[in-house]
Amino acid sequence: MNLEGKIALVTGASRGIGRAIAELLVERGATVIGTATSEGGAAAISEYLGENGKGLALNVTDVESIEATLKTINDECGAIDILVNNAGITRDNLLMRMKDDEWNDIINTNLTPIYRMSKAVLRGMMKKRAGRIINVGSVVGTMGNAGQTNYAAAKAGVIGFTKSMAREVASRGVTVNTVAPGFIETDMTKALNDDQRAATLSNVPAGRLGDPREIASAVVFLASPEAAYITGETLHVNGGMYMV
């Protein structure tokens, strides 16, 4: 899976799954621009990417920030070949207790930017008649989870968006897919106590949490020439927790 000469943009690349994706794309030969919400986070991305890319500060909820970031990338690197929409947050609460801000924050961060970022890179991809858009979803978007109606709705929306956009752009050589992780070893899961961890693993036939690099491998495959005939799909990477 050689990605030499490709320009990749990965949102939310400062740590966890996003960082693993950015690092593996670099290993496969791509030049990677990773984004973070702060200048400090962007600097950290630049440090780990080295001469193979750079970090930029991006607020995915702000239209002007998106436009400015994409202009910088186009001016310095050229048109984007691979977009990985990874940035996201959680605001968990039971529906009866959920505040409007908790709902809106999730939709505005986890769903709306998928539309804005994808639309922003699409013209360049269609002009080249080639492109890859990979959206990072979640197992919660298909199976649901108590306390996450906002998050589940957003991630289910990502899947619907992916399928619809894929139908619109397939004839132009652009593929659009979703990778849906299950429970992955991240800073958030490392904070679980033993009982919480055991309860989580009881639902995973593989008997372990996933590694961020396993998600990255799925993303990089979908970004590769070998995946040119795959579009509109959701690739579940969850250790058997949810089987379609």
Curated annotation (Swiss-Prot):
Pfam families: adh_short_C2 (PF13561). Pathway: Lipid metabolism; fatty acid biosynthesis. It is an enzyme of class 1 (oxidoreductase). Its EC number is 1.1.1.100. Substrate binds at S138. The keyword Repressor does not apply. One of its GO terms (molecular function) is 3-oxoacyl-[acyl-carrier-protein] reductase (NADPH) activity. It catalyses: a (3R)-hydroxyacyl-[ACP] + NADP(+) = a 3-oxoacyl-[ACP] + NADPH + H(+). InterPro entries: 3oxo_ACP_reduc, NAD(P)-bd_dom_sf, Sc_DH/Rdtase_CS, SDR, SDR_fam. GO terms for biological process: fatty acid elongation. The active site is at Y151. Keywords: Fatty acid biosynthesis, Fatty acid metabolism, Lipid biosynthesis, Lipid metabolism, NADP, Oxidoreductase. CDD domains: BKR_SDR_c. NADP(+) binds at G12, A13, S14, R15, T37, N59, V60, N86, Y151, A152, A153, A154, K155, I184. Belongs to the short-chain dehydrogenases/reductases (SDR) family. Homotetramer. Catalyzes the NADPH-dependent reduction of beta-ketoacyl-ACP substrates to beta-hydroxyacyl-ACP products, the first reductive step in the elongation cycle of fatty acid biosynthesis. This is 3-oxoacyl-[acyl-carrier-protein] reductase FabG. It comes from Vibrio harveyi.
